[in-house]
Amino acid sequence: MYTHLQGDFTLSTFAQVDMESDFDAAVLLVMVDDANWGKLCYEYSSQRPMIVSVVTRPGSLSDDCNSLAVPKTGIHLRITRFGPCFAFHYSHDGTWWELVRYFRMECDAPVKVGVVAQSPTGNGCQVIFQHLTYSPEPVTEIRSGK
């Protein structure tokens, strides 16, 4: 499920995943096109729930960054855009946010932004997204997430 957004924004949600197979995940995705996108995942990786981010750029392979292990009970995910820059944050409580990734992605046209459930090695997974929230305002303190 996605929408097109132009300009600055912040999109956040609380995600839960049943996590049975490797890489089962709840994902917040930002996409310019098939060769230019980024995703922030609450993912079952290395036999535990983790925060994972991936950025793909034209002419290169995707990178994959396992950030840290988190509780299996669910996590808050957030993408914010300001100009050509994007930041990925996670939070345990939806109040205090931790920076996962900060990167530049050129895009003059509107970008696709939305939620994805993925289970690339399994038979599917149940993902629940709660409180999907949009704001036209970006986060102003990227490092602290405020």
Residues covered by each model-derived region:
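Extracellular glycan-recognition regions
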Residues: M1-K146
